[in-house]
Amino acid sequence: MNNTNDLYNRWLAQPDLDDAVKAELVSIAGDADAVTDRFYRDLEFGTGGLRGVIGAGTNRMNLYTVRKATQGLADYLNASGLPKKVAIAHDSRHNGALFARETARVLAANGITACMYPRLEPTPALSWAVRYLGCGAGVCVTASHNPAKYNGYKVYGADGCQITLEAAEKILAAIEKIDCFDDVRLADFDAAAAAGRIVTIDEKCLDDFVQAVYDQRVGDGAGIDALKLVYTPLNGTGLECVKKLLKKLGVTHVTVVPEQEKPDGDFPTCPYPNPEIREAMQKGLELCDKVRPDLLLGTDPDCDRCGTAVPDGKGGYRLITGNEMGIILLDYICRTRLAQGTMPADPVAVTTIVSTDMAAPVAKKYGVELRRTLTGFKFIGEQIGKLEAEGRPERYIFGFEESYGYLSGGHVRDKDAVNATLLVCEAAAWYAQQGKTLLDAIEALYRKFGYYRNALCSFAFEGESGMHTMQELMKKLRANAPEDIAGYKVESVVDYDTDGTGLPRANVLEYHLDGGHKLMVRPSGTEPKIKVYLSAVGDSEAAADAVNAALAKAAADMMKA
């Protein structure tokens, strides 16, 4: 049965259908486009799990799609020989607690112990719990920094990383055999809890997570107690763990943005709660004008990304980009560990193919091996796992990606904004001891290594036709590689969807241009959009910015269907 109207009618005819789902289905009766959009496909399950708009239908996040995915996960676990235990967390999004509870019910009905945090917690705390509790998998109900209408379902492996492509394919194969109404086993929550099949994660687990982050300190902490901070959790999960960490560090001058302090799935002050964008940080910046802190820190709803602003020397505050902070922290960690004699032999730093090329000369200066992975922090986590398997986990010193994700230890296997808070505070305090800010730090690095400018252009393609348009655009780009982009000769093209790159195949095109500039095209794995990453380098800020502006215009032209 694949006719959208048939699916719609079958859903509507279900006895005991969830009230909210039923009301939505009734409201779209006779609206062919609305019915088609909800039923023309199943939500795609991949290495990022599920992510979609909350609502009714097979192409939405709801009780039934979550239960179906969990039944597939349970079937996979029961056939795999992995521990029959799963850690579960959720963030502040709508239906987060409900979806986490339904996940636990399905797992319990399949003989798998569900370990649930008693309240909303950060994604890195979920990665920690998987390893800490010896679980076979983990589930985090989150849509990260997407708008309020979204929710998601991230699956983690026993190593605390988001699942590999191989695991995702096996889970998907199991999911595809399941009818969301007829084939899902479902336990009574209270009965399963009484039987020990659903358990609450002990507070010690979270306390030990915060301690593990604290143990990632790089320097001696001199001057850190003098730091003055403004912090915003963007109505998400970060407040508890970040405040606990700051207290351990001795950072007591902390002002929390009041409108964004409490969890709120509507994200009323910022429709797109992403610390990468100014709009999300605007309330924090306004508070900075009154409080005049040394740092503004913002974490996204599931507290795995961290944004920063610092005084600009002109009475205002400047946002530091994810690439800039990655370079600042890489340089700080390397110079500090060398000075203190704590740098391991054969140190390794890891970044992604869409992150700044500036990492290469910085790593080279300090004798650090730089590894590049595909987009997604799970690939950085995999590199930590490889070093661990070799018996040399201490070689890993830092990993970052351009989208504001950082990690300096192996305590978790995903980006960690609590860890980022520690590193940013340490680096800011170290520079403050010299009368400098983090802005001074990145400017000095630009002067030394060149002015690297990176930008991200996103092009949305909504609905069923949008997915087709995205596929056709990528096909066209592969068939007809441009000879030049923005007037810069295309010197080479790397298609990551082929063998020979040294990385797993991925739907990414990379154009290397004359002058050391670069443009990369990548369809998002979680949203209906194509992302174009721009990279320019020049001997001045103005020169690099001019190239980036030209590349941005060229990218827009390339995306026209």
Residue ranges, per PLM feature:
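Glycine-rich phosphate-binding loop plus the immediately following alpha-helix
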Residues: Y156-A187, N323-P347, T351-V362, A417
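An N-terminal, well-structured beta->alpha segment
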Residues: N2-T103, N110, A193, I198-A226, ...
